[in-house]
A protein has these predicted regions:
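Non-catalytic surface loops within mature trypsin-like serine protease
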Residues: 10-12, 58, 91-94
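Glycine-rich beta-strand-turn "strand-cap" elements at beta-sheet edges
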Residues: 2, 40-48, 76-102
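Short, structured helix-loop boundary elements
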Residues: 15, 19, 49, 68-71, ...
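An amphipathic, aromatic/His-enriched active-site/gating alpha helix that lines ligand/cofactor pockets
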Residues: 28-37, 55-88
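Short, well-ordered beta-strand segments in beta-rich or mixed alpha/beta enzyme
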Residues: 2-9, 39-66
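N-terminal first-folded block
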Residues: 2-31, 35
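Short acidic, gly/pro-rich beta-turn/loop elements at beta-sheet edges
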Residues: 16-18, 48-50, 62, 97-99
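Generic hydrophobic alpha-helical membrane-segment signal
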Residues: 22-25, 42, 71-74
Length: 102
């Protein structure tokens, strides 16, 4: 499984516009093949900081998403409405039940 975290600091005047855009985009992205989660969170201490969390089944489905029109729209919205976006990716492996008890 691949997890992508995108942290953005939204321009204060664009915060409501960003929330509307990301709500619509997140629900569309969630319908893409291989997407296990697409959600966003607002920082408790900074109302203009948001984190978008995506979980993908594998690298192949993530790569397909990164080539999609939806991703291009997402990047465009982030570039117009935010400053200095930060994208982190981590690969994860689901542990067997026995391994989690150790």
């Amino acid at each position: 499984m691949i997890i992508r975290l995108t942290r953005v600091d939204i321009l204060p005047a664009k915060r409501q516009e960003f929330i509307q855009a990301i709500k619509a985009l997140a629900s569309e992205i969630l319908n893409e093949m291989g997407c296990r989660e697409c959600s966003f969170f607002q920082d408790k201490e900074d109302e203009n900081r948001f984190t978008l969390k995506e979980k993908w089944a594998n690298q192949q489905t993530l790569d397909k998403h990164l080539q999609s029109d939806k991703y291009a729209v997402l990047v465009g919205a982030i570039n117009v409405l935010s400053k200095n976006p930060e994208i982190n990716k981590c690969s994860t492996q689901v542990l067997e039940e026995d391994e989690t008890e150790r």
